[in-house]
């Protein structure tokens, strides 16, 4: 097959029977068609593959042209935070629940995948956020987020106080359960559950969504994605186990008086889709919107 992709990485959901079946089928399909197939180490161990083509996510990103992620959106998010640092295209086979980011059905993924491998696909780039925690002016920790960065308390049902600055300008102070800073990709995730607006993927925008604020006037706001969001945590907070959560998978410790900077990352996730992909079809299907009347 004459393909724009020569080296393909397989990344998956370890110890998941359905995902393992799909990964095994993909490995056989790709190797018999002459592709160089690299396998994520956790997946390889589960499938019993032990050779020089087994490697970690960073090595996969350095060597692969295309990465196929088999699992749910959580698996895609974990892989995407690493793969976004490299010029590698990513497509997903859904073996999770909603599957906003994993286009291909596990029942009939071969035909659309074959079209993608032959060079017939749609391509898009999704920006990520970078969240960093500063303490007494020193950068203590940082990470990337595909969906959202969330400041939240460490104690259940315990409000925290903080100030919000946009590009250095004070916006408001807030007493709440925290705040969500979401990308367009993340606007259909935690942000949506908290009452935030859905942002279409091509928008250069982010949304700030308060979490149970102790006021009737605080509402979500949409900002230019090139804005720098600064959260100044009140030193009077009694909770010393606060966190910034990136995609619900990576946590950064936050203490009273800390400062959190959230801004658009220089890294982008390169997604590829089948030619019949439609973002609004995905929304309609995943969120249960009404179908056409006539």
UniProtKB/Swiss-Prot annotation:
The Gene Ontology CC terms held by the record are:
cytoplasm
Q: Which UniProt keywords apply?
A: ATP-binding, Cytoplasm, Kinase, NAD, NADP, Nucleotide-binding, Transferase
Q: Name one process (GO BP) from the record.
A: NAD metabolic process
Catalysed reaction, written as an equation: NAD(+) + ATP = ADP + NADP(+) + H(+)
Q: What is its main location?
A: cytoplasm
Cofactor(s), by name: a divalent metal cation
**Lineage top rank: taxon:** Bacteria
User: EC no.?
Assistant: 2.7.1.23
Location of this chain's protein in the cell: Cytoplasm
Q: Does the keyword Transmembrane helix apply?
A: no
Query: What GO MF terms are annotated?
Result: ATP binding; metal ion binding; NAD binding; NAD+ kinase activity
For the protein in the UniProt heading, the enzyme class is: transferase
Keyword Iron-sulfur among UniProt keywords: no
- Residue positions annotated to bind NAD(+) are 73-74, 147-148, 158, 175, 177, 188-193, 249
Record: active site: 73 (proton acceptor)
Q: What PANTHER family does its record include?
A: NAD KINASE
Similarity-based family: Belongs to the NAD kinase family.
Query: What is the documented function of this protein?
Result: Involved in the regulation of the intracellular balance of NAD and NADP, and is a key enzyme in the biosynthesis of NADP. Catalyzes specifically the phosphorylation on 2'-hydroxyl of the adenosine moiety of NAD to yield NADP.
Annotated NCBIfam families: PRK01231.1, PRK03378.1
User: What name does UniProt use for this protein?
Assistant: NAD kinase
The protein's organism comes out as Aeromonas salmonicida (strain A449)
């Amino acid at each position: 097959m004459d393909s724009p992709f020569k080296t393909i990485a397989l990344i998956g959901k370890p110890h998941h029977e359905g995902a393992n079946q799909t990964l095994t089928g993909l490995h056989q399909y790709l190797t018999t068609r002459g592709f160089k197939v690299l396998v994520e180490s956790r997946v390889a161990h589960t499938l019993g593959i032990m050779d020089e083509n087994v490697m970690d996510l960073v090595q996969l990103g350095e060597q692969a042209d295309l990465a196929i992620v088999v699992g749910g959106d959580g698996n895609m998010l974990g892989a995407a935070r690493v793969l976004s640092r490299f010029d590698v295209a990513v497509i997903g086979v859904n073996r999770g629940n909603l599957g906003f980011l994993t286009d291909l059905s596990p029942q009939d993924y071969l035909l659309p995948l074959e079209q993608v491998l032959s060079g017939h696909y749609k391509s898009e780039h999704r920006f990520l956020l970078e969240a960093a925690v500063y303490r007494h002016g020193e950068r203590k920790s940082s990470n990337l987020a595909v969906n959202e960065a969330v400041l939240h308390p460490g104690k259940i049902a315990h409000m925290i106080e903080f100030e919000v600055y946009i590009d250095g300008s004070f916006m408001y102070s807030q007493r709440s359960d925290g705040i969500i800073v979401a990308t367009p990709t993340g606007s259909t995730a935690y942000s949506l559950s908290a009452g935030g607006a859905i942002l279409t993927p091509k928008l250069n925008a982010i949304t700030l969504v308060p979490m149970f604020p102790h006021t009737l006037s605080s509402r979500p706001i949409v900002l230019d994605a090139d804005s720098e969001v600064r959260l100044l945590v009140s030193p009077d907070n009694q909770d010393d186990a606060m966190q910034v959560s990136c995609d619900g998978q990576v946590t950064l410790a936050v203490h009273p008086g800390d400062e959190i900077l959230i801004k658009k990352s220089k890294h982008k996730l390169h997604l590829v889709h089948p030619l019949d992909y439609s973002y609004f079809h995905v929304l309609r299907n995943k969120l249960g919107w009404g179908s056409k009347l006539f």
